């Protein structure tokens, strides 16, 4: 089973305008793993696997929370590029339902890491877009907790995490 916090409805009236204004609801969806893989392959998207060293109790807490999030309006959230997106939802769960500590971050600003992200390469206007969407926030240095707001940044952050019992989070 795959839980996906990055689901949205393209049929939302004024989709692009609502996204730019920060008024777009995203939602949690669930699918069979094989269906998820086939959809990503069809769309030409990549998937990176990261195996986590979680206890049975941590897995159960997280799974129960995900199931509760699927109920009714719990599944919807107002998308925010930095503080509440499909990546931050995973990050928040990881630190809420495990005994792991957030590692230090050397990120200098939100803008630098968005513009330099591998999936943004070759898009010359991305800096302007970040300025328009984020305003002055784009030049702020994120806290260690905020630093995992993009998939690649969270992937790297998780790879460096150890739990309070000294076990590595990533197997």
Regions found by a protein language model. Give the residues of each.
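Generic structural motif
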Residues: 6-10, 57, 137
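Glycine-rich catalytic cores of cysteine/serine-nucleophile enzymes that process amide/ester linkages
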Residues: 1-45
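Helix N-cap and loop-to-helix transition residues
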Residues: 32, 55, 109-111
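Glycine-rich phosphate-binding "P-loop"
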Residues: 51
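A structural motif
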Residues: 54-67
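Activation targets extended, charge/polar-rich intrinsically disordered C-terminal tails
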Residues: 68-171
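Acidic/histidine-rich, surface-exposed loop or edge segments in extracytoplasmic proteins
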Residues: 39-48, 67-75
